């Protein structure tokens, strides 16, 4: 039977519950336990798919096509375990399910209420993850902050969960803040005390406190927190600010988080194997020369909008012994200021995904700059579509070329709507989503990077390359290096005349892992290193890991 761990947060939002949950998952996995992690988000949206990146950050896409919270990306990267749509639960999806059941008459005329119907639905979602994953331990992160009205049904549900399983099958972790007051020179415990008091008033006594702080927490302070909060002193776990999120598992291991959780759950504390993770952190802290990568996007005011892209670049730099320096470039600024003022001195350019007209011409201009200046370039989703438009306009002679997303009446729609999207009206959850196969063309850079005939990548798009123009592109020098197995959909393109110019319709960033960088990102960084002084190496001379088999 599975064991269950619940992670709540107090005092402030964005306190790091997701990283704590992901780090615990890594620590448990390093001891031989299988884990699955889910997120309970207390907003009324059914999923974050239609939410603004400025409000929510990136939308992370799972293998089975769910549009989810970016924390699921952390879960996957830390545990190297694929999550599913079951691992993402929102208040909106809970209410939608309960209301649908009521409309079908499933409640036999009963009065449908938050308690017991909503809380029961929440508990059933957690049990469903357990049944589907067969994991030894299910970790559940509850979004929001204890004390928020919108989180109450979730907190009540995890309180009730004690009745579903044995007391030794469940553990509660509360992540809280210990602020330092400069004027008094003291770390204050009162916010933590009040947060635990609030949690207790709901009926939940935390078993472990993970205390965020920017400085060391001494034994005396831990004893004080233990006394006021009813938690064993050994279960007061300091979580100091870290130089990298990937060093957090090592810090929490040192402080004994995993040991305490296993003790509460009455599980054996096996030998911990973090040798590869420790080597990764050593490499991260001792990088080689810096590589400057420009990320040209629409949402650059909020870096979390491109979180997986940043992490994929970081993974590639770790593997290539490089220090990552990201230059955030607004696509709209390129339209007004020109690429020569914003992209000079850049070692590589990434144009990530997005939607709508705003900033598209700036992206196209940046791609032209990368092509003409022979700067390593990687386009993702909309980035590939912009690369296609740039080539059509400037090389293939189609000056009016564009996407039908940008101009429904375009004379040359080199990018057009997927046929199956023609009659779609709703925006949420209706795109081409999830994992699809891509057949790679032999003797192309893409094939060489992957080292596979067929790869599987995650998608999130409505528009595609228009095959009416395929012959024109190939004849003018474009190389189509990856398609759907039936050859109908163009998935990966490249320019053989360029040091590194490739773009894909999918989102490779979702599959990159700290110890297994995605081949396209690693290839980009390796190509960028050739532009650095005193870096005598050939592009792709290193044998890239067999990415898909190790996935």
UniProtKB/Swiss-Prot annotation:
Ranges for domain Glutamine amidotransferase type-1: 292-534
Mechanisms controlling activity: Allosterically activated by GTP, when glutamine is the substrate; GTP has no effect on the reaction when ammonia is the substrate. The allosteric effector GTP functions by stabilizing the protein conformation that binds the tetrahedral intermediate(s) formed during glutamine hydrolysis. Inhibited by the product CTP, via allosteric rather than competitive inhibition.
Pathway listed: Pyrimidine metabolism; CTP biosynthesis via de novo pathway; CTP from UDP: step 2/2
Residues at which CTP binds: 13, 148-150, 188-193, 224
CDD domains (UniProt xref): CTPS_N, GATase1_CTP_Synthase
EC category name: ligase
Residues forming the catalytic site: 381 (nucleophile), 507, 509
Record key words, sorted: ATP-binding, Glutamine amidotransferase, Ligase, Magnesium, Metal-binding, Nucleotide-binding, Pyrimidine biosynthesis
Binding site for Mg(2+): 71, 141
One annotated GO biological process: 'de novo' CTP biosynthetic process
Chain positions recorded as ATP binding sites: 14-19, 71
SUPFAM superfamilies per UniProt: Class I glutamine amidotransferase-like, P-loop containing nucleoside triphosphate hydrolases
GO CC terms of this entry: cytosol
EC number from the UniProt entry: 6.3.4.2
Known catalytic reactions: UTP + L-glutamine + ATP + H2O = CTP + L-glutamate + ADP + phosphate + 2 H(+); L-glutamine + H2O = L-glutamate + NH4(+); UTP + NH4(+) + ATP = CTP + ADP + phosphate + 2 H(+)
Source superkingdom: Bacteria
Positions annotated to bind L-glutamine: 354, 382-385, 405, 462
Protein family according to the UniProt entry: Belongs to the CTP synthase family.
Reported function: Catalyzes the ATP-dependent amination of UTP to CTP with either L-glutamine or ammonia as the source of nitrogen. Regulates intracellular CTP levels through interactions with the four ribonucleotide triphosphates.
Subunit structure: Homotetramer.
Miscellaneous comment text of the record: CTPSs have evolved a hybrid strategy for distinguishing between UTP and CTP. The overlapping regions of the product feedback inhibitory and substrate sites recognize a common feature in both compounds, the triphosphate moiety. To differentiate isosteric substrate and product pyrimidine rings, an additional pocket far from the expected kinase/ligase catalytic site, specifically recognizes the cytosine and ribose portions of the product inhibitor.
Entry protein name: CTP synthase
Annotated source species: Prochlorococcus marinus (strain SARG / CCMP1375 / SS120)
This protein's encoding gene: pyrG
């Amino acid at each position: 039977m599975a064991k269950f761990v619940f992670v709540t947060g107090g005092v402030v939002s964005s306190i790091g519950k997701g990283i704590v949950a992901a780090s615990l998952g890594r620590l448990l996995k390093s001891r031989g336990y299988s884990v699955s992690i889910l997120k309970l988000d207390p907003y009324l949206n059914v999923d974050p798919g239609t939410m603004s990146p400025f409000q929510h950050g990136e939308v992370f896409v799972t293998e089975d096509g769910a549009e989810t919270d970016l924390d699921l990306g952390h879960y996957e990267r830390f545990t190297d375990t694929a999550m599913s749509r079951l691992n993402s639960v929102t208040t909106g999806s809970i209410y939608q399910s309960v209301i649908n059941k009521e409309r079908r008459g499933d409640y036999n005329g009963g009065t449908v209420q938050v308690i017991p119907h909503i809380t029961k639905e929440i508990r059933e979602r957690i049990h469903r993850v357990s049944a589907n994953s067969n994991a030894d331990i299910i970790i559940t992160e509850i979004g929001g902050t204890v004390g928020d009205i919108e989180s109450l049904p979730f907190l009540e549900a995890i309180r009730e969960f004690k009745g579903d399983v044995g007391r030794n099958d469940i553990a509660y972790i509360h992540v809280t803040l210990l602020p330092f007051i400069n004027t008094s020179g003291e770390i204050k415990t009162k916010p933590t005390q009040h947060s635990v008091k609030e949690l207790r008033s709901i009926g939940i006594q935390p078993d472990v406190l993970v205390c965020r702080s920017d400085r060391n927490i001494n034994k005396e302070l831990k004893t004080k927190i233990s006394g006021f909060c009813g938690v064993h002193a050994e279960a007061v776990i300091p979580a100091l600010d870290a130089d990298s999120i990937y060093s957090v598992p090592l810090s929490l291991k040192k402080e004994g988080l995993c040991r305490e959780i296993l003790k509460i759950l009455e599980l054996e504390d096996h030998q911990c194997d973090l040798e590869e993770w420790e080597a990764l952190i050593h490499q991260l802290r001792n990088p080689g020369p810096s590589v400057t990568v420009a990320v040209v996007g629409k949402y650059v005011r909020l870096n979390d909008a491109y979180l997986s892209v940043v992490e994929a670049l970081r993974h590639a730099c770790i593997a290539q012994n490089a220090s990552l320096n990201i230059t955030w470039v607004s696509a709209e600024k390129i339209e007004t200021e020109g690429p020569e003022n914003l992209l000079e001195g850049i070692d590589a350019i990434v144009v990530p995904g997005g939607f709508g007209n705003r900033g598209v011409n700036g992206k196209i201009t940046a791609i032209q700059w990368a092509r003409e200046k022979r700067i390593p370039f990687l386009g993702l989703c909309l980035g590939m579509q912009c690369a296609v438009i740039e080539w059509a306009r400037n090389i293939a002679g189609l000056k009016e070329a564009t996407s039908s997303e940008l101009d429904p009446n375009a004379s040359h729609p080199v990018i057009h709507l997927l046929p199956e999207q023609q009659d779609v009206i709703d925006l949420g959850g209706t795109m081409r989503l999830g994992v699809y196969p891509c057949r790679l063309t032999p003797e192309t850079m893409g094939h060489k990077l992957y080292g596979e005939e067929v790869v599987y990548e995650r998608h999130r798009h409505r528009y595609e390359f228009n095959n009416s123009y395929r012959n024109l592109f190939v004849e003018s020098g474009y190389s189509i290096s990856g398609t759907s197995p039936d050859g109908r959909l163009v998935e990966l393109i490249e320019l053989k005349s360029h040091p590194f110019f490739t773009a894909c319709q999918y989102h490779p960033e979702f599959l990159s892992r700290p110890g297994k960088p995605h081949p396209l990102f690693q290839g980009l960084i390796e190509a960028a290193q050739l532009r650095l002084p005193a870096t005598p190496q050939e592009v792709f001379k290193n044998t890239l890991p067999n990415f898909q088999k190790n996935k």
